Structures are given as structure tokens and as C-alpha cells.
Curated annotation (Swiss-Prot):
Protein name from the UniProt record: Zinc finger protein 80
Keyword NAD: no
Family: Belongs to the krueppel C2H2-type zinc-finger protein family.
Zn finger spans (C2H2-type): 69-92, 98-120, 126-148, 154-176, 182-204
Role of this protein: May be involved in transcriptional regulation.
One Gene Ontology term of the molecular function aspect: zinc ion binding
Primary location: nucleus
Top-rank taxon, per record: Eukaryota
Length: 213
């Protein structure tokens, strides 16, 4: 895929595009040395148009209850605006509004799309005040901070062992259930975690990354 500025495209009946502009360029910059993301006008894809108030969602799925709107698919009723419920219903419909033009990965929400873009740009705005380590997501920073606080919120109900990270906790749970998600193509052997599979694969490839001097 050709490298270029990251952009956003809507995967639906109309396409919306974002373009990246530098500071003080085209009169759209903020002057703070940062790039901006500018929303372009919607472009019709030629598909059948829908009413703006429905946004592609059947009104039968929207139920007004008091001051909130309830989703008939999953029962959530935490939406105080019809537009928020419509956006939520796209999850059930499989619609992913935000697509990365760099790698093609798509997301339901902008809040997930923006941190993903930082993988390509290398931006890591979330910094740990304890050790200075930086992250591209605030959630990653919060998980990292447990190293300093000693917090281990995930406890195994089988053996009582506690963990700071959910991913490590899930891998530990597999030792009790016997579930193994990662398999070797060469021998058909399976492993609890991807790192174990990687080490095993090096046996077949002959790779020896750690050389003794």
C-alpha cells in the first residue's frame, strides 16, 4: 500500500474524508506546531440515499424510554441522544465508520481510530510521571502505572493468583482450562501465549537471536 498522509473514510452510503494539514497552512493551522485533521464535505457513493434522521438504521430498533434511548439489540439505554444510539447500533450492523488509509483497519468510533493513527505517526502523548515512559493510548498508560502502584485487579478464581494486566490474566486462566490458542504449523503443537509460539518457531527456523560473546 502506498505510503502517504493518514486519512479517514466512512464505510457506508456516503463517504467522509479527513485530510491532514500542517500549522498555518491553507489558513487552517493552529500555529502550535501540530498537525490538524480537517473534515471534508460528504461525497455520495451513488448508493440509495437514506433520510438524515435515520442514518441507515431502522426506526424499529430505536425505542424512546423517558430521557434516554434504548437499543433493542442489546438492551443498553445509556444514550441521551438519538444520534448516539444510531452510532451504537452500527456496532450491531457491522458498520465501521473510520477506516485507516495506511493499513485498511476500520473502527466503529473515532475514539479508537485516533489512537490507532498514532501507531503510524509514532506519536505517544501519554507520559508516565513516575518513569517517563510514553504511550499512544491513555488506557495503556493506566495499565503501565500499576507497575508503580502494585495494583493487581485481576484475580484467578481457581488459584487466587493476581495480575496487573488483563492479557496476562487471560493467558494464566488457560493453564486451568487447557485452552491453547496459538498453534505451530510445522508440528501442530499448541501454546498458551504467542510469545511461547514465537520461541518454539525459532527451533524450526534455526534463528538464534541471543548470541553469546
Amino acid at each position: 500500500m502506498q505510503k502517504g498522509p493518514l486519512s479517514l473514510a466512512t464505510v457506508s452510503h456516503t463517504e467522509t474524508f479527513w485530510r491532514k494539514v500542517g500549522p498555518k497552512r491553507d489558513g487552517l493551522g493552529t500555529g502550535d506546531g501540530l498537525h490538524s485533521w480537517v473534515l471534508q464535505e460528504p461525497v455520495s457513493t451513488g448508493d440509495n440515499p437514506r433520510e438524515c434522521d435515520s442514518q441507515g438504521t431502522s426506526k424499529d430498533t430505536l425505542v424512546r424510554e423517558g430521557k434516554t434511548y434504548k437499543c433493542k439489540e442489546c438492551g443498553k439505554d445509556l444514550f441521551n441522544k438519538n444520534s448516539l444510539l444510531v452510532r451504537h447500533h452500527q456496532i450491531h450492523a457491522g458498520v465501521k465508520t473510520y477506516e485507516c488509509q495506511e493499513c485498511g483497519k476500520a473502527f466503529h468510533e473515532k475514539v479508537d481510530f485516533v489512537p490507532h493513527m498514532r501507531i503510524h505517526t509514532g506519536e505517544k502523548p501519554c507520559k508516565c510521571v513516575e518513569c517517563g515512559k510514553v504511550f499512544n493510548r491513555r488506557s495503556h498508560l493506566l495499565c503501565h502505572h500499576r507497575i508503580h502502584t502494585g495494583e493487581k485487579p485481576y484475580e484467578c478464581s481457581e488459584c487466587g493468583k493476581t495480575f496487573s494486566y488483563h492479557s496476562v490474566f487471560i493467558q494464566h486462566r488457560m493453564t486451568h482450562t487447557g485452552e491453547k490458542l496459538f498453534g505451530s504449523k510445522e508440528r501442530g503443537k499448541t501454546f498458551y501465549c504467542n510469545s511461547s509460539l514465537t520461541r518454539h518457531t525459532k527451533i524450526h527456523t534455526g534463528e538464534k537471536p541471543c548470541k553469546v560473546q
